[in-house]
Amino acid sequence: MTEITGEMRTAFREQGFLVVPAVLSDEQIAAGRRVVDGLLADQPIADGQVGPHFLWPRFGAAGHPLLDFYREVGVAALAGQLLRSDLAVSDPDFAQVATTIPPWPHRPGGPHVDGLTPCEDDGRPSTFSVLAGVWLTDQGQRHRGNLWVWPGTHLRFGRYLAERGADALRRIDEMNPGPYPKIELGAPTQAVGTAGSVLFAHYLLAHNIGGHDGTADDDRRETIYYRLQASGHRQRWRTVVTDPLIEFRA
């Protein structure tokens, strides 16, 4: 099993994201791409479409190929190395298939936080502990559909909520478009790495989709995202968003 080192955990705590290389074998990458191809056959990309194309398959009682893939890759065990040892990773109930079709020379104007538009039926924000992105295509170069992140913003967002109370997370009218709060962002960077890497990003980290500067003959970007909750997260979400490292080991 791939090991997340103490140095990598420190980088995640400080920066809010981590790219773990060489998690998937070539066979697992190929299997993941076959699953994506099957889903896109049912919900195809339109002829001539460029830019992002998303699918949001939910996992029912009968299971789902993307849940099987999640388990085969060992995403939970890997994410668990970031969490405190007394916390487990709950199985996700849906995934996001994120593709970017070139050419799409887009640059994000700013970041967002997930799960606020809309909130859940009871008004609770759809918070989670960590975003896991399984990279099925190479993202070793910038501007190939890479995720843009603003390092350290998870900590500043946490301070913002600690000062105003956790329910300020729902007051998007007080935030910048995105939505994301009016805090210091710093300079963004693009997450880079090879196919078979797994990206982890803190829930509060500022992020957004980037453009794909390739040609129409280049491969589309393919990532499978899973939004993961540590055990008990739903019950303590207010504590988690005001103390953003409380679920993670040092």
Describe each model-derived feature in a short phrase:
Residues 100, 150-157, 227-233:
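Short edge-strand/loop segments of extracellular domains
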Residues 19-20, 134, 199-201:
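Short hydrophobic-aromatic micro-motifs
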Residues 139-206:
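Double-stranded beta-helix
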Residues 1-14, 21-121:
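Non-heme Fe(II)-dependent double-stranded beta-helix
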Residues 107-116, 167-185, 214-218, 239-242:
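Short, surface-exposed loop/helix-turn segments at secondary-structure junctions
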Residues 42-51, 162, 195-250:
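Non-heme Fe(II)/2-oxoglutarate
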Residues 119-142, 192-195, 227-230:
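Short, conserved beta-strand element in jelly-roll/cupin
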